[in-house]
Amino acid sequence: MTPVVTRPDRDRPEEESAVSFEDSDVVRSAVRVEGFRDDEFNYQLIRALGVADYGGSTVGECLAVVAEITDGSPRTWALAFERLAERVEDRGRGCLDAGRRVSARDHLLRASTYYRTAEYYAESVTDGSHRTGERSRACFVEAAALLDPPVELVEIPFEGGSLPGYLVRPAGSDAGPAGGLPTLIGVGGFDSSAEELYFHMGAPGAERGWNVLVFDGPGQPGCMRRNPDMTFRPDYEVPLGAVIDHLSGRPDVDADRLALAGQSFGSYFAARSAAADRRVRALVANPPVVDMSRYMEAWVGKDVFRMTRDIRPEDVIGVPEDLLPHQMQWGIGAICHRFGVPSFHAWRQAIEAYRLGGLTPSITCPVLALVGEREGAEPLDQFRSFVAEVGGPVTSVVFRTEDGASTHCQSDNIRLSAQVTFDWLDEQLG
């Protein structure tokens, strides 16, 4: 659930610009670098901007769409980003029709991001979210075929369904060494997608000589669109075991050099797997989540988390903003859907099971723990607890504000995060 946090008005008057060209006939830029007063909206904007590092967005497109969004309104966010995605997709298809493969690829990659960004706040998690999520995947699949080498679509059999994903391989890997390449499995969080993980892990890993598998697991939108009953589960070592089984049988994968990298909620999933499965030879936790219940209480606030009144998704339909903020209405629907529970209280009880507890000392492979210094007191506390309790060698990195990488999952500096992550992985398994 997303809390509504606004920045207080400044007491001091706003300083005037030292130089203004408003009355000039030459204007260098009419674009203003402006975000939102709502902190979560700002983070989601940074999240969309961040993937520009690997071709997933452009600064101009993201800043232009801000003007179409009402601060704090999930509905206007979803509509504005969907319109942007449609415009960019149309350009990409025009380039494809004209035989301009590189231009088509670039546009379709960005359209995929903008559809995913719209999906995050789509008003209905079973309707609008489904539509934009499918279009995000469709654009990425077409772009993936235009990459060099093409990204491979994978379907991992699991419990009567399948987990969709992508295997991203380095250039020239078709003639790779006997025994295969080191391989990283990227594990996303509550609202991530395999397509987004391509920009965070797939592209930076492939250019460093790694295979990278990114996938959508139980509870994540890309999985639930095709497997509606595959909701989140605390024993994520089970689906991750199926992913490792799939990779271990491939000749282009070195099964003795398998690593996991979990982002956000995904770090809990990855840590569970590393504790249970000795085939995992290295683990990256970004940031470590050892207790999801504590984490969520700190995020939404104690009063909201412990409220005595239970709320079901159907209870909030049409409720005015002044009675229940739109973001909270959206959040209740999203958490109930993804966890497969009927109400807020049922969700609060369910996430009690998402704790590492005594499992952390069982993680004996090398571990890299990452966190941004401005993620907040609770993530930093869980980071320190995890580092202290891990049973194997651990390297810890706190990203600083001055490095431009202090946000959640270093969404503001993916290239720096990738450098730290893959340099460490090369030292362990390269």
Name what the model sees in each region.
Residues 363, 369-371:
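Short beta-strand/loop motif that positions the catalytic acidic residue
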Residues 178-189:
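Short beta-strand element of the alpha/beta-hydrolase
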Residues 365, 378-388:
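Short alpha-helix in the alpha/beta-hydrolase fold that links the catalytic acid
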Residues 230-252:
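Alpha/beta-hydrolase active-site loop
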Residues 387-406:
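Catalytic histidine neighborhood in serine/cysteine hydrolases
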Residues 410-430:
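Catalytic active-site module of serine/aspartate enzymes centered on a nucleophile-bearing elbow/loop
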Residues 116, 248-303:
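Primarily recognizes the serine-hydrolase "nucleophile elbow" in alpha/beta-hydrolase
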Residues 81, 131-176:
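N-terminal cap/lid segment of alpha/beta-hydrolase-fold proteins
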